[in-house]
Amino acid sequence: MLGIGAFKQRMPRSGEALPGRTQALPLHNTHLINGHPLRGEFTGLAQVQFGLGCFWGAERKFWNVPGVYTTAVGYAGGKTPNATYSEVCSGQTGHTEAVLVVYDAQAVSFEQLLRTFWESHDPTQGMQQGNDVGTQYRSAIYCSTQAQYDAAIASRDAYQQQLTAAGYGDITTEILYPAPTFYYAEDDHQQYLAKHPNGYCGLGGTGVSCPIGLDA
């Protein structure tokens, strides 16, 4: 039998993923910072999912961006439906810790969000982010439209040039369209650093500026 550590650097294969559950985890559907719903139809607004390491600090990066309507943290990109945090930490779900960003495209461009994403973490680290090691910390952009996907790919290629010039390796960010199912995380993880101001935040960027979104 494989130990939990076996799944820290690789995705679970067929038959290895935890079964999960059909029922969604309980959720208090109000954003602690802005009072907007965490879950809904969001008619007239755009959505994207970002994975950039521990989602506690990652969510704060985006709720502070003007034009963002709401944010929520959850699990995406894996195999286990409605996984719990402890299950995701085992590495046996295949999920990454993700932030759902719902935004008004008339108030903030997707390119501006991409710039925040790239500059807020090191996207060259594979299945880890800093001292946080595991598949749940991999870098990811899960797109809801083809236009988002095209922009994400273009931004990756542009940022790769800057990173290469600064001595970094290849970007390992997983970019997908259509976006996989987003499973909301437990209540305590939502807006975690607002509830726990001295809570852990292991995010750290490369210090390399992203050349997109500068004039948006």
Curated annotation (Swiss-Prot):
Keywords: Oxidoreductase
Entries under InterPro entries matching the protein: Met_Sox_Rdtase_MsrA_dom (IPR002569), Met_Sox_Rdtase_MsrA_sf (IPR036509), MsrA_MetSO_reductase (IPR050162)
Family indicated by similarity: Belongs to the MsrA Met sulfoxide reductase family.
Taxonomic lineage: Bacteria, Pseudomonadati, Pseudomonadota, Gammaproteobacteria, Lysobacterales
Entry's EC annotation: 1.8.4.11
PANTHER family: MITOCHONDRIAL PEPTIDE METHIONINE SULFOXIDE REDUCTASE
Identification of the protein by name: Peptide methionine sulfoxide reductase MsrA
Gene: msrA
Organism: Xanthomonas campestris pv. campestris (strain ATCC 33913 / DSM 3586 / NCPPB 528 / LMG 568 / P 25)
Signal peptide: none
One of the Pfam families matching this protein, by short name: PMSR
